[in-house]
């Protein structure tokens, strides 16, 4: 039997917004398996939608820029948000975006080797890290290119916590930016329903089929109910099916059709996606409530 620690309960609560005892019970039932515990809570309707499973956990900043037919988006991480707002960190952030846009490196190794005024980009990162006293890393970047018939939409949100690039055809810059703003706010995972991997759909279906509220309903009724829920699940994940944030009930697809535009791709960065933070004092608070 795995030991159910306060830290484990805390992590599950952060991912699902479940209560302390619900989280502890799910972990006990699944012998401490985090993914299975999340599924158990979803089946019982205790967990929030899957968005909570992707809690942001690191500090730093994103940046996005464009010039001509090229756009670049980057994420630079620090250990604290205090350093992320430091002038030297911000100067490094903008320098990094600028040289990556200019040089279009193939990977992180090539990006860090880009020559700058004083040595390489990596040298600048090390120097800024030494000045701030914190580890600073270039976590990721993307360079996107377009043709003359295409339009970029670039947008940064929450002071650089989120950045987005959209690539549209037959679009003006206002429409492209509006879509980028929508993506920043709503965080779609995929462009369309068809882009959602089959295993993601099947996994969600298996959870919904076990949902407590379906009870002893006949299988054919269960299938219809689950089909409806899967439709809503896919609409939440797929950009084109989401209600457009600046519209009046229309979907993103309907808005784009009205504008005569087509979206080809998008990239959304949010600081710290998928990075584990160090444990905070909240674990101690959870322990007190569990052991009460």
Swiss-Prot record:
Q: Which InterPro entries match?
A: EF-Ts_dimer_sf, Transl_elong_EFTs/EF1B, Transl_elong_EFTs/EF1B_dimer, Transl_elong_Ts_CS, UBA-like_sf
Keywords for this protein: Cytoplasm, Elongation factor, Protein biosynthesis
Q: Which domain of life is it from?
A: Bacteria
Any one cellular-component term (Gene Ontology)? cytoplasm
Which segments carry the region annotation Involved in Mg(2+) ion dislocation from EF-Tu? 80-83
Location(s), subcellular = Cytoplasm
- UniProt keyword Membrane present: no
Keyword Ion transport on entry: no
In alphabetical order, the GO MF annotations are: translation elongation factor activity
Q: Which family does it belong to?
A: Belongs to the EF-Ts family.
- According to its UniProt entry, what is the function of this protein? Associates with the EF-Tu.GDP complex and induces the exchange of GDP to GTP. It remains bound to the aminoacyl-tRNA.EF-Tu.GTP complex up to the GTP hydrolysis stage on the ribosome.
Name of the protein described by the UniProt record? Elongation factor Ts
Q: Which organism is it from?
A: Oenococcus oeni (strain ATCC BAA-331 / PSU-1)
In the UniProt record, the gene name given for this protein reads tsf
